[in-house]
């Protein structure tokens, strides 16, 4: 338990934590094969200009393969340690990088800092937060591929977000001090959704794919003691 506590401290301090061997070799190979199968079936949502192909429907199409990744036992201590019962899956997205790939500098939760300001206007509102868990399906290493963060990027609001100026935002990210990770097949990186980050292939012919679980903290969790049943999520926020 002390190791988990230390890693939670690291997650808060650094904005990320690398969990080695989160998936067994068998789990990793199964997920990799099914992501490749999804590509063969044409289930991708698209292929963007930087070389990222993404899939948003795999949890619904193949729950027997992808549902075990949600709150996986190797990752649960970190998700639960940060968010407890208020941890909610927002989405599961798989990626394949079929050719050259240099991801744009980006944040998954761009709205974090503005929401942090807005919440101060209200008596009961809680700060929205998000945490990602990315499972890597191949070995990344120097000369092959990597994951890069802006160092301490979860603690500092980047400029050029309001209004958003992507070229200036990306230039700012590129000019900062970075941390570079080389996750191996089966590793999982858990990180704050608002930290600026960038994935890349250093070798164009490298096979590279991953699965990301986006989590968010939702105070009214399923099973909380209340007299009524929740209607769900979509269309239930009248002031949003």
Regions inferred by a protein language model and the residue ranges of each:
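A structural signal for short, well-ordered beta-strand segments
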Residues: 92-94, 133-135, 211-215
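Non-heme Fe(II)/2-oxoglutarate
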Residues: 6, 41, 46-47, 163-164, ...
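A short secondary-structure junction signal
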Residues: 101-108, 114-117, 143-150, 158-162, ...
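A contiguous catalytic/ligand-binding core that recognizes phosphate-bearing ligands
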Residues: 112-141, 150
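Short, surface-exposed loop/helix-turn segments at secondary-structure junctions
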Residues: 107-118, 163-177, 226-231
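Non-heme Fe(II)-dependent double-stranded beta-helix
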Residues: 1-13, 20-124, 234-237
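Short acidic/polar capping segments at secondary-structure boundaries
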Residues: 94-99, 110, 136-142, 153-156
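Double-stranded beta-helix
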Residues: 127-130, 140-198, 220
